[in-house]
Amino acid sequence: TPVCHLSFFEADAYARWAGHRLPTEFEWEHAATQHRSRTHLASGTAEKPASLPKSSPSHESSQSISGNFLETGNLHPIPATSREGLQQLFGDVWEWTASPYTGYPGYTPLPGALGEYNGKFMSSQVVLRGGSCVTPATHIRPTYRNFFPPATRWQFSGLRLAKDAPKES
């Protein structure tokens, strides 16, 4: 079962203790968009996790996103049943990244609009990715960003570990 109810600082400390790190927001997004198989987060029951219909506005790159979403009635994290590929990217817990919540590279707000990013309010927030078991499936996509204060524990926050690839000699 995924670890949840962690602050960013706790997630980062654990990752370092384990000899890993938290992924950056862009590493997380790259992994999520490149992972084609979208393995289901099986609950060990006959229930099939929800997935987004291809006509959904959140459906990207003709990929199906599956997970334990609000619509399944699974309102707690459920462990994956197989070890193939990336698991549980969507629908269990929001995963802390190592990235501050800032505008995307090249982002410029329209004149007079606060837009997605308001530097004054967002300057101390950290990005979470993936969605939780209480996030509606229609909100989930590999590019969806969430944010939270780094010192705050949240019942729907967790972590994913990353490790640098070995350097070629």
Question: How would you describe each model-predicted region?
Answer:
Residues 1-141:
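Functional-site microenvironments in short loops/helix caps that host divalent-cation chemistry
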Residues 129, 136, 142-150, 157-159:
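Extended alpha-helical regions
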Residues 115-120, 146-153:
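Short proline/glycine-enriched turn/loop segments at secondary-structure junctions
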Residues 153-169:
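Short, structured beta-strand segments at or near domain termini in extracellular proteins/domains
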